[in-house]
Amino acid sequence: MEFNIKSGSPEKQRVACVIVGVYESRKLTFAADLLDRISNGFISDVIRHGDMEGKLGSTLVLHSVPHTLCDRVMLVGLGKERDFRAKEYREAVRASVKALTQTSASEAVSYLSELTVKKHDVEWMIEQATVVTLDALYRFDRFKSKQDESVREPRKLTLAVPRRSDLADGEKGLQRGLAIGNGMKLAKDLGNLPGNVCTPSYLGEEARKVAETFGAEAEILGPREIAELGMHSFLSVAKGSAEEARLIVLKHHGAKDKNDKPIVLVGKGITFDSGGISLKPGEGMDEMKYDMCGAATVLGAFRAAVEMNLPLNVIAIVPTCENMPNGNAVKPGDIVTSMSGQTIEILNTDAEGRLILCDALTYAERFSPATVIDVATLTGACVIALGHIATGLYSNQDSLARELLAAGEEVADRAWHMPMWDEYQEMLKSPFADMANIGGRPGGSVTAACFLSRFAKAYDWAHLDIAGTAWKGGKDKGATARPVPLLVQFLQDRADIALGNVVRRGRPRREAPEVADDEQD
């Protein structure tokens, strides 16, 4: 779909649909009020008769509104004005896009992006409208023999800004939103692919395509090179499958000084997780294709960063393989030596994500990173603790944790800081090796993070457990692309710091605009 930024009065838009908002108090937004006045109270009459109450997310499409040039006017409920914040704004935008796909309108102009959201500016409004729109329009129908013709994606969406002087900021927000949306689409596409398509080698080739498209560096290592690095923990998982392992390394040299310490993103890439010899139950095992969503979101965030050409050095590392139970598979009780030299007793082969991540974390040391963030669908225990709302966040630096929490809040991709006290480390003791790969059922998400922390002592490190947030089940089944928005916002914040800018946290914006004659298109 094509996006555009425009400043102009709603009644002068010769387009298939104009989108405006209505509050629950029946108060019209600035753009809706302009349409109401030009139509001699047509919209007010509709509201007065109770056809639109303004409840958040409700929509009503009006045809042939008098004295306007558009074919339709869509009214979107915004809820109570005093409660209208970032969350409500996103919900209203999403509702408008969903309703638009149920019409035959091929073009629309949305004035929701002109609304006032406390502490947020034009750039943020446009960015978020773009991200939400792309997310709402996303469909994964690659393997459908027939397309769903009941949903019609508009050809063009124009997002309105209050004044001509806002066009430049609006364009910045649009480009950021497109980059984030494209990164999310990549993450969702990779996550939704079946395991017989999205194999480790396929993931490696898709990563290479991203690098080639944006001029980044790509290095894809196979089993021989991985073994030469001493990544025997990683390979212990991979050897149970006929699919060969890959270690994907992508590099973006965006900083002025190419020697600046990079930010390293590490993503767990188990393209299918049967559990190995510690076999999972059959029910729901199909969803274990999503066990590579850590890898998918790291690649998605990397794609967004390079598309935005962030002035940072960013490296993505993805260890990827299958966890399968063939005759060569690792067994409970086996002991392996990690790349770091630390030995691991494998008590449960279904705790395999940490076994591939630990070697990737050791590998990251060679880049002398400023920060390392690993992302993984690591533990069911995190789902029990936090449900499907928040990502579990662990870190060896509280300041880094605060940065990530703030980034997540800014873009509605929330995380929660979990404890990682020394007492939990005791649960990983093994009588035969330096550590066991599990610490028992209690505190399973914490002990998994504690395990990883033993391989991340050389740098500032954070771990995002996305087992509860990476995908949805049920009727809305599919990958969510979380935490791509959080990661990209974090990278943008670090880029602002590198440039000496104040970290962008929703700069205050003007109140409802007054549209002057010379500002109308």
Swiss-Prot record:
It is an enzyme of class 3 (hydrolase). Keywords: Aminopeptidase, Cytoplasm, Hydrolase, Manganese, Metal-binding, Protease. It is found in: Cytoplasm. The keyword Metal-binding applies. The active site is at K280, R354. InterPro entries: Leucine_aapep/pepB, Macro_dom-like, Peptidase_M17_C, Peptidase_M17_leu_NH2_pept, Peptidase_M17_N. It catalyses: Release of an N-terminal amino acid, Xaa-|-Yaa-, in which Xaa is preferably Leu, but may be other amino acids including Pro although not Arg or Lys, and Yaa may be Pro. Amino acid amides and methyl esters are also readily hydrolyzed, but rates on arylamides are exceedingly low; Release of an N-terminal amino acid, preferentially leucine, but not glutamic or aspartic acids. PANTHER family: CYTOSOL AMINOPEPTIDASE, LEUCINE AMINOPEPTIDASE-RELATED. Presumably involved in the processing and regular turnover of intracellular proteins. Catalyzes the removal of unsubstituted N-terminal amino acids from various peptides. This is Probable cytosol aminopeptidase. It comes from Chromobacterium violaceum (strain ATCC 12472 / DSM 30191 / JCM 1249 / CCUG 213 / NBRC 12614 / NCIMB 9131 / NCTC 9757 / MK). The lineage of its organism: Bacteria, Pseudomonadati, Pseudomonadota, Betaproteobacteria, Neisseriales.
